[in-house]
């Protein structure tokens, strides 16, 4: 089965941890993830500036490792990211900000990428965003 995964909640939320575990289990079960899409507060999971407490699970590092190990397509919504200060080098320069906190393996792109992923996957599975 082909999955598209969308994460709407920040790294410290239960939904973010469930999204990671679901993704790991799907891959371990031989399924395909066509795209990971980070939207709303989920964009913080891609930020290099998130620091987890010493006794806490480092979810952003776990996402990065999963994406790199499996060669996954990991897209961060550009509009949501900009509003939350999650910038790659190009956007930091464009807006005159002192530094970027988003790099490989993440890609900034638009909401159309979520739509495209949903169309090419058998299932779109969303985590969080139920406030």
UniProtKB/Swiss-Prot annotation:
GO molecular function, one term: sulfur carrier activity
NCBIfam families according to UniProt: PRK00207.1, sulf_tusD_dsrE
Keyword field: Cytoplasm, Transferase
InterPro entries: DsrEFH-like, Sulphur_relay_DsrE/F-like, Sulphur_relay_TusD/DsrE
Active site, UniProt feature: 77 (cysteine persulfide intermediate)
Species this chain originates from: Pseudomonas aeruginosa (strain ATCC 15692 / DSM 22644 / CIP 104116 / JCM 14847 / LMG 12228 / 1C / PRS 101 / PAO1)
Top-level enzyme category: transferase
Source domain of life: Bacteria
Family: Belongs to the DsrE/TusD family.
Keyword Cytoplasm: yes
Main location: cytoplasm
Function per UniProt: Could be part of a sulfur-relay system.
Compartment annotation: Cytoplasm
Gene from which the chain derives: tusD
Any single Gene Ontology cellular-component annotation: cytosol
GO biological process terms on file: tRNA wobble position uridine thiolation
EC number(s) per entry: 2.8.1.-
Pfam families xref list: DsrE (PF02635)
Protein name per Swiss-Prot or TrEMBL: Sulfurtransferase TusD homolog
